[in-house]
C-alpha cells in the first residue's frame, strides 16, 4: 500500500486501519481506559490513533507538567474541521496542559503566496477569535511564526540536522520546491518543539492533535528531537541478563559528562562518550537521586511519586511481599529511576547549552466528510460550514446535505437508514449532540426505520443555527478581550 500523506492537499483516507501498520500509529481505543474523563472525540472513536499518548495520560493523572501544541495556516475560512482541533486544544488546556497555538503565516506565505498583512488579518479574524470563543484561556500562548524569535531561531538550528533527501522522502519535495517552502517545514518542527525550550519550563511531554495528513510533520519532528539532544538515555542489559541505564552523549562536552556523573549517586562508570548507571535502585537511592533535580516543582512531583511507592510497599506488609508485589514495586522503582535520570540529564544539557527534547506525542482524528459527500474543501462553500457563516445559511446547508437515508419514505421505514454514511448524522456525532445516550438513540432509530431524514435534518439544522449564533456572539466578546491574551505578532 502506498498511502502517501500530504499536509498541503485535500486528503481522502478511506481505511484508517492501514495507517497503524504503515506509519506506526497505535489504536487509540487501547489507551482509552487510562484517560480521566475522556473527550467526546475519544469516546466516540473520532480520535482513532495516537503516538506516545501514554505519557500525556500519565501527566493528566499525576499532575506532571505537559503541553498541547497545534497550529493553523491562515489560508481561508475557519470551519468545523478547524473546530475539531480547537476543541482538543481547549480540552487539554482544561486538563492542565500549557497551551501553544501557532498561526503558520510562514507556511501561508511560502505555500499559498499570501502577503504578511493578509496572513495577520485571516489569522486574527478567523482563527484566533474562534479559538478564544471556544474556550481558550489567556494563560496559553498564541503567536505568528514570523514574529516568534524562539521559533525562528530553533527552526534555523533544526535545518542543520535535515537535508533535501530526507525532506523529499517524507514530503515528496522535488527540484521545483522553493527554499521558503522547505524552511516552513523546519518552522513547523520548531513550533512543535518550542514548548520544551528552557524559557517555557524545559523538557516535558507535548501532544499535537492532528488529522493523519499532518503526520509527516510529526515524523520529521520526532526524528529531529533525537538528533538535537545532547544525551540520550537507554535501557541496557548485562551479559548475565541484568538491567542498567546508560546515558549516551556522542559529541557532548567532556565537562557535561563529568557534571552528570557528579549528580548520579551510587555506582556510576564514566567512559569517553557515555555513562553507565550500575546502581541497583531502591528507596534510599531514589531519595538521594531526587535531590539532584534543581527545579523545585519537578523535584516535589517526584518526591510524591516516591512516597506513593513507599506507601504501597508498607501497606503490603506484614508478613511479606508476594512475588507479584515485589515485581510491581521493583517496576515502579525502576521506572521512577529512569524518569529522574531523564530530568537530571535535561538539566545538565541545558546548563551546557544543549537540548533534551522528548519526542512529541500525537493524536489522530478522522476527517469530516463534505456536506454533499466526498471530501470537505474550503474552496467549495457547500461542502463545509464556516464558523462565520450566517446562522440561517448554516442551517440551510444542513438541510441541503447528503443523508444516508433511502430514496422513499416507505423504503426508509422498511429498510432503515445508514447513519454511518450520513453527513447530517456526522454533524451530530462530531459537533451538535453532547449526550452519548441521545446520539445512540438517534442512530438506532435511523437504523430501524423509525426516524426519518426530515426530522434529523430539522434537528441538526436547529442545533447548527443555535451553535453558530452563540459562537459568533462569543467571537465578538473575544474581540474585546484580545489584549488580555499573549499574542506575538510579526513586527
Swiss-Prot record:
Cited InterPro entries: aa-tRNA-synth_Ic, Rossmann-like_a/b/a_fold, Trp-tRNA-ligase, Tryptophan-tRNA-ligase_arc
Species: Methanosarcina mazei (strain ATCC BAA-159 / DSM 3647 / Goe1 / Go1 / JCM 11833 / OCM 88) (Methanosarcina frisia)
Motif mapping: 'KMSKS' region: 375-379
Catalytic activity: tRNA(Trp) + L-tryptophan + ATP = L-tryptophyl-tRNA(Trp) + AMP + diphosphate + H(+)
GO biological process: tryptophanyl-tRNA aminoacylation
Keywords: Aminoacyl-tRNA synthetase, ATP-binding, Cytoplasm, Ligase, Nucleotide-binding, Protein biosynthesis
Protein name: Tryptophan--tRNA ligase
Family recorded in the similarity comment: Belongs to the class-I aminoacyl-tRNA synthetase family.
Ligase recorded as keyword: yes
Highest taxon in the source lineage: Archaea
Gene Ontology cellular component terms for the protein in this record: cytoplasm
GO molecular function: ATP binding; tryptophan-tRNA ligase activity
Sequence motif 'HIGH' region, location on chain: 74-82
Subcellular location field: Cytoplasm
Pfam families xrefs: tRNA-synt_1b
Region of interest called Insert, as start-end residue ranges on this chain: 295-349
Amino acid at each position: 500500500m502506498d498511502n502517501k500523506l500530504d499536509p498541503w492537499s485535500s486528503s481522502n483516507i478511506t481505511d484508517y486501519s492501514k495507517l497503524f501498520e504503515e506509519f506506526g500509529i497505535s489504536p487509540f481505543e487501547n489507551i482509552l481506559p487510562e484517560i480521566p474523563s475522556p473527550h467526546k472525540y475519544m469516546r466516540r472513536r473520532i480520535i482513532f490513533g495516537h503516538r506516545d499518548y501514554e505519557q500525556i495520560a500519565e501527566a493528566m493523572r499525576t499532575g506532571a507538567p505537559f503541553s498541547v501544541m497545534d497550529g493553523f495556516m491562515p489560508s481561508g475560512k475557519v470551519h468545523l474541521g478547524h473546530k475539531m482541533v480547537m476543541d482538543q486544544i481547549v480540552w487539554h488546556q482544561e486538563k492542565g496542559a500549557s497551551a501553544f497555538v501557532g498561526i503558520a503565516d510562514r507556511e501561508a506565505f511560502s505555500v499559498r503566496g499570501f502577503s504578511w498583512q493578509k496572513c495577520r488579518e485571516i489569522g486574527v479574524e478567523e482563527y484566533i477569535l474562534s479559538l478564544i470563543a471556544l474556550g481558550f484561556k489567556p494563560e496559553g500562548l498564541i503567536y505568528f511564526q514570523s514574529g516568534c524569535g524562539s521559533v525562528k531561531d530553533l527552526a534555523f538550528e533544526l535545518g542543520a540536522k535535515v537535508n533535501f533527501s530526507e525532506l523529499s522522502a517524507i514530503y515528496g519535495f522535488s527540484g521545483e520546491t522553493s527554499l521558503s517552502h522547505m524552511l516552513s517545514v523546519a518552522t513547523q518542527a520548531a513550533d512543535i518543539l518550542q514548548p520544551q525550550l528552557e524559557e517555557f519550563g524545559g523538557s516535558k511531554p507535548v501532544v499535537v492533535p492532528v488529522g493523519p495528513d499532518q503526520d509527516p510533520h510529526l515524523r520529521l519532528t520526532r526524528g529531529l528531537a533525537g538528533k538535537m539532544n545532547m544525551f540520550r538515555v537507554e535501557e541496557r542489559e548485562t551479559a548475565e541478563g541484568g538491567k542498567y541505564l546508560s546515558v549516551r552523549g556522542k559529541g557532548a562536552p567532556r565537562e557535561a559528562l563529568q557534571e552528570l556523573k557528579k549528580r548520579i549517586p551510587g555506582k556510576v562508570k564514566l567512559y569517553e562518550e557515555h555513562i553507565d548507571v550500575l546502581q541497583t535502585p531502591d528507596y534510599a537511592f531514589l531519595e538521594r537521586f531526587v535531590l539532584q533535580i534543581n527545579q523545585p516543582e519537578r523535584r516535589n512531583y517526584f518526591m510524591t511519586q516516591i512516597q506513593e511507592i513507599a506507601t504501597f510497599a508498607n501497606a503490603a506488609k506484614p508478613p511479606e511481599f508476594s512475588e507479584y508485589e515485589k515485581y510491581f514495586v521493583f517496576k515502579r522503582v525502576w521506572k521512577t529511576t529512569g524518569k529522574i535520570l531523564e530530568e537530571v540529564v535535561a538539566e545538565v544539557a541545558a546548563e551546557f547549552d544543549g537540548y533534551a527534547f522528548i519526542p512529541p506525542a500525537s493524536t489522530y482524528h478522522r476527517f469530516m466528510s463534505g456536506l454533499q459527500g466526498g471530501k470537505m474543501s474550503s474552496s467549495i462553500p457547500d461542502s463545509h460550514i464556516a464558523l462565520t457563516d450566517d446562522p440561517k445559511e448554516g442551517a440551510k446547508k444542513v438541510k441541503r446535505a447528503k443523508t444516508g437515508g433511502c430514496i422513499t419514505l416507505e423504503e426508509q421505514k422498511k429498510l432503515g437508514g445508514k447513519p454511518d454514511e450520513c453527513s447530517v448524522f456526522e454533524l451530530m456525532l462530531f459537533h451538535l449532540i453532547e449526550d452519548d445516550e441521545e446520539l445512540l438513540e438517534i442512530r438506532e432509530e435511523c437504523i430501524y426505520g423509525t426516524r426519518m431524514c426530515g426530522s434529523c435534518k430539522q434537528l441538526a439544522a436547529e442545533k447548527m443555527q443555535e451553535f453558530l449564533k452563540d459562537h459568533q456572539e462569543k467571537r465578538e466578546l473575544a474581540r474585546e478581550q484580545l489584549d488580555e491574551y499573549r499574542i506575538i505578532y510579526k513586527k
